[in-house]
Amino acid sequence: KSKNIIKDETINKIKVRSQKVIDLPPKDLRKLVDIGKKELGEGIIIVFAIKDGKIGLAVGVTDKLTNKYDAVKFVKTGSEIVGGKGGGGRSDFAQAGGIEENKIDDAFNKLKSLI
């Protein structure tokens, strides 16, 4: 079973990276988002990390897209689906948590539908 699953796609002309990582501490999420931003150049990065039964969610939006997309809105929506609350950050990077691992795919689908 892979511990790091990355899927890059284009949704409505915007590059989107969905990433799910097993055994990653939530504090390392920002690093993955930064790498994703560099590799995509421009786009939206959605990362879920699972460690010790807890879920971390981080969303990054590259600078040119922050006038249209807000990372905070994405993490609030995503964390509600996985049983978390709130979350916060800035329009270009936001983070939240959750507990329902089996809902991660639902959260990915919902977040992609917002793009």
Predicted regions and their residues:
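Hard-cation-handling environments
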Residues: 1-14
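Glycine-rich, acidic loop segments that terminate in or are immediately followed by a histidine
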Residues: 14-115
